[in-house]
């Protein structure tokens, strides 16, 4: 029996010159600051299509850095977005990064409003920044489940593949199974762990 909890990988979002030094994943920027005390920039622009990048923005704000968030969504609402608003973090909804600008490193970005159907851009603006922190949501790390012969399936809600029907004695939990709530992850992991223990020992404890 194998309990797989291999996590997930943050996706980038593609735009012009996104290989310019200073373009980083939002989660990496947060970890550098929170764990190592390293700032990836003093004028961060955060480009996202989901809530997780707001954690990065909040971490910047706690360290007296004022980020600007560009969110592709029209009117997203959640607890973490409300928290960011209450902290005075600047946000632009229905906005995208068109291109990073700068030669040896990012020094600005071309941004634009995007239509509701995501097909048309408004007037392109230029905004000063020294880094662009990107989050295109998370892709479950399904490699171990897939290699075991598990027939994966596509989850439209998260736009990613997750483990489907198990072929060997493997069980996948947490974000590797498309569950991104810590509470739900812990609950299901304990449940599956208990089931496996009961199966192996024939004891219900």
Describe these PLM feature segments.
Residues 1-205:
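Residues forming the flavin
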């Amino acid at each position: 029996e194998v309990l797989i909890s291999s996590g997930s990988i943050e996706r980038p979002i593609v735009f012009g010159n996104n290989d310019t030094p200073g373009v980083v994943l939002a989660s990496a920027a947060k970890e550098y600051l929170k764990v190592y005390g390293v700032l990836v920039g003093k004028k961060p622009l955060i480009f996202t299509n989901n809530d997780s990048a707001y954690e990065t923005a909040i971490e910047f704000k706690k360290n007296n850095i004022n980020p600007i968030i560009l969110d592709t969504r029209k009117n997203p609402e959640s607890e973490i977005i409300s928290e960011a608003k209450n902290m005075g973090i600047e946000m632009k909804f229905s906005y995208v990064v068109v291109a990073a600008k700068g030669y040896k490193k990012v020094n600005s970005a071309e941004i634009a409003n995007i239509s509701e159907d995501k097909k048309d851009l408004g007037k392109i603006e230029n905004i000063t920044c020294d880094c662009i922190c990107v989050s295109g949501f998370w892709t479950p790390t399904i490699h171990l489940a897939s290699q075991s012969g598990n027939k994966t399936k596509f989850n439209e809600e998260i736009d990613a593949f997750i483990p489907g029907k198990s072929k060997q004695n493997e069980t996948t939990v947490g974000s590797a199974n498309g569950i991104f709530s810590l509470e739900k992850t812990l609950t299901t992991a304990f449940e599956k762990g208990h089931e496996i223990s009961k199966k192996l020992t024939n004891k219900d404890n």
